[in-house]
Amino acid sequence: MTMNSKRQWLKFAGGSTLAALAVSSALVGCGKKEEAAAPVAAPASAAVVTKPEPLKVAFAYVGPVGDGGWTFAHDNARKAVEQEFGDKVVTSYVEKVPEAADAERVFRDLVGQGNQLIFGTTFGYMEPMLKTALDSKDVKFEHATGYKQTDNLRTYDSRTYEGAYMAGVIAGKMTQSNTLGVVGSIPIPEVIRNINSFALGAQSMNPKVKVKVVWVNEWFNPPKETEAAQSLINGGADVLMQNTDSSAVLQTAEKNGKYAFGWDSDMTAYGPKAHLGSAVINWAPYYIASVREALDGKWVAGAGKHAWWGVKEGAIDMVSIAEIVPADARAAVEKVKAGLKDGSFSIWKGPLLAQDGKEWLKKDEVADDKVLSGINFYIKGVEGKVPGGK
């Protein structure tokens, strides 16, 4: 029954009741006084179903949504949340939020707007999010790539080093100069892991390779990324990987007739001749799972509540591998994927040497997540020094 038909029924019912009361009154007036008419009950009101208010979910991004990389991947996942839950959620985002003191203002503003679940998508939001969370106990917070948690703040990450390893497998096969290059963003464990993993993947196919690194100390700065990529090419690198957010590295490789990989998102379109494959992150499975927990009242935070998803969970992949990549490299990538999914393969299994030649992992020793979370040095085969590290 539509709302209009409900209103018409109530109008009809009300009119009929009044008519019935009038007739009863007339009959009482003509009959015995002791036979008063029994009171007529008013019609029951139609049951009103109250629709639950949608869950308000907000995202804070360090870069623009159109960066083609990191932020683009997060925003695609936000859209996937909307598609999954429909009118049960309302999402919003703020882009280009700097990793600085002003980030706290942004998070407090998101709280003030009534958001119930807030995602901060870069490492530098850690302290601003923690401060805001401690003052906003009725709001749920999730911080990407961080490590500090509290009762209403938990952390999550993707095993991007798995994508870096697969890129290394391809790079080790494709290089002619045996020199690979990486444009690094911020020298934190997350990025250092990726550089080392890229080197290990390359060494698995070509023990002669060496890896050079140029740091730009920013996540998104296309001019700096371009300059760094050109510097690596000038230094002999013929295959590049990046841990930055724009497509500048791939575009620079294309202009120079070299090879490169997409990072975080599929970047094929930005340099189709240079593109060997893209190490992508799919944040959608995690965001959908987290929002579902919040909707179902099962969302839990606290010390140790950290999710770290990779190939196994469908969060990491190597996609759009170029046709020029040889069959044996393609097969090696697929073997790595299968091993990561079923746990039969570990990237961080000894014997592995640090850059200075000292043993880091003994034979068959496997670095656990705690060790990987604090890595601040290069492995053997990576040149240069980690800024502020070893």
Feature annotation, model-predicted:
Residues 9-10:
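N-terminal export leaders
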Residues 26-29:
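C-terminal motif of bacterial Sec signal peptides marking the signal peptidase cleavage site
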Residues 32-390:
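A residue-level marker of the well-folded mature domains of exported/periplasmic proteins
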Residues 20-24:
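Alpha-helical transmembrane segments
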Residues 4-6:
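Residues that mark the N-terminal boundary/hinge immediately upstream of a DNA-recognition element
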Residues 13-18:
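Sec-dependent signal peptide hydrophobic core
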